[in-house]
Amino acid sequence: MKKSLLPIVALATVVLASCGGTSDWSWAEASADETLNYALLIGQIDHNDSAARTAGIRTALGTRAAADLGKSTSSANSEVAVEGTLELADGVTYKTVEIESGEQKNTAGATWDQQTATSTAENWTAKHGNDIDFFVSNNDGMAEGAIGASNWIKGMPIFGYDSNESTLQYIKSGQIMGTINQNASAQAGGLYMLARNCIDGVANPTVNGFSEASANGYGKIGSEYNYNETNESMLVNNFTITADNVDQYAGKTSADLIDTSVTKGTTETVKVWQSYYNAADTFLNSSMKPLFQLYADTFNFDVTATFGNGADESLATSNLEAAQKGDYDAFMINMVKTTAAASYLDILATKLDATAETPTNTPVIFWNRQATTEAGEVDADVMKDARFNNIYYVGFDAVQGGQLQGQMIVDYLNAQAKA
């Protein structure tokens, strides 16, 4: 904030502000010193989607080091942010500073934690006051947690990611500036389409029902998917929601969001197993779960769902251990830790009597959380496990989503600068 140029008569205000005092947010005050300080709420340090969002934010704001720009986004949360510059629509080149950042993990070990974000925002605001010019969050839940801080500055810009219905209402009321929609309907429909194709033994399961109509009457996913054969991933693009277009999406039920180009197919009902990494996750509960429940009938699935604690894999793996061979025709896994894919495959290989010599055709599809190595890179090797003929990942394009979030922030700042 620009305090040094304030009149002498405002000395008391200067002293208060320099000690982290707060007043309602305004662009005039935020931009006065030509420095934009932001605070970043990180979901999970070693999560590739979290890292991709962090990379997108820092790249857009100029705070990702030049030496890191050519690297994979997977290590972005472990990188050190640098002082950057950003030229806005008013012709001013602002200095950009990541004044605070941190993983939002609770005492039980659960990451992406909304309540922790509330405490974090309170602490950072108490420390810096109006010296923070805006907040950015790796997801909507933490953004909502932040605005719930007891000392939250009225009008403080904050940007989320996930397009939770509650966040859309906050965008309508001006408390959150924007979010990124993961295209939940396309993710849910795409996951079930791919699982159905594999169960039914359809040729070209990543094409049938995606770029061409389903051979078994399930229609065609309306959103474009991009298939990467190297790591067996099926990715759908994200899109931005701000005050300009929020009315197109707010207040919609899951039934409103169902892809009408997907239709009820003709193959028999089968039993499938599906895990959710955290029973308390806002995005999964409000966006994904209701869609899956509707799509289950469309794809003739009898779904057994299991819900994790967000801290470790124990609840999901113990449930999986209890399954018997023949209980399920497909397994759809939403991991807590993205490095845990191999442990799930080991359990399933034992259950299904699968070996490299006698691989199983039972599909195993990871969803929304992509398998990574300890270094945070997409784990192409685990996705080629020779014990399984059908291993895939279905989710959103994390890198494209991170870039969109970064651009959304810059667009907002440009609008403020032009006002």
PLM region spans:
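A residue-level marker of the well-folded mature domains of exported/periplasmic proteins
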Residues: G20-A419
